[in-house]
Regions:
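C-terminal subregions of glycosyltransferases and related glycan-biosynthesis enzymes
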Residues: 108, 114, 136-214
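Nucleotide-sugar donor-binding/catalytic module of glycosyltransferases
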Residues: 1-148
Length: 214
């Protein structure tokens, strides 16, 4: 076993399916989960990623939360600072899978975040508010945030304080592979530059870089 992220990308290299879905061994898929995802992205020819909502449950399948609230649209400015979907809720089309195979990352924080980044940069991300999976919550429960001004402000500052480690390495590697969109390239570079305290306020004020959870 080479770890979750490396194992996923190794399997991705071996698949030639039209649609690829991620799966965790202890989650429960509800009826129509696969059909719903395919229906949502089947009309797209560009690299496309489906992300579904999820019902959080404990080890005994008692419901903790009926689903996440996403009031903001998915996009590259969001993907730069957080992953909004668990891998087990995702499905990608062949076009995205082929693009990902060209550049297998070594510094990805986690595979599902890298896929969100790539899809948001290269094509389309479809977020489905309706959950089709019971997701077992391990450890501490997720804590929701806020998309208010102050929620965004606190979230960005918290992100910037820890951006020098794995997150910065992920963005540095992503920059090496993907650099064909001038606007998105500027957003990425802005975050990398924010490791310098003097440039952090520029990111804090930039509304095109945003978090779903404060």
């Amino acid at each position: 076993n080479t770890g979750v992220t490396d194992s996923f990308f190794e399997l991705l290299k071996k698949s030639d399916a039209d649609y690829i879905a991620f799966c965790d061994q202890d989650d429960v898929w509800l009826e129509q989960k696969v059909e719903r995802a395919v229906d949502k992205i089947s009309s797209f020819t560009e690299p496309t990623l489906y992300i579904g909502n999820k019902i959080l449950v404990d080890a005994d399948l008692n419901i903790i939360s009926e689903g996440d609230s996403r009031s903001l649209k998915p996009g590259f400015g969001n993907a730069l600072v957080e992953s909004i979907g668990s891998g087990c809720t995702m499905m990608m089309n062949r076009s995205l899978a082929e693009a990902l195979r060209l550049h297998i990352p070594k510094q990805a924080v986690i595979h599902d975040w890298w896929c969100y980044l790539a899809a948001a940069y290269l094509g389309t991300v479809v977020y489905d508010q309706k959950p089709y999976i019971w997701y077992r919550q391990h450890g501490n429960n997720e804590v929701g945030g806020s998309d208010s001004f102050f929620g965004q402000l606190k979230g960005k500052i918290r992100y910037l304080k820890k951006s020098r480690g794995k997150l910065a390495k992920q963005l540095e590697e992503f920059k090496q592979y993907y650099h064909s969109d001038e606007k998105k390239d500027r957003q990425l570079q802005e975050l990398l530059d924010a490791s310098a305290v003097s440039k952090r306020m520029k990111v804090v004020r930039d509304k095109t870089i945003y978090r779903q959870n404060g």
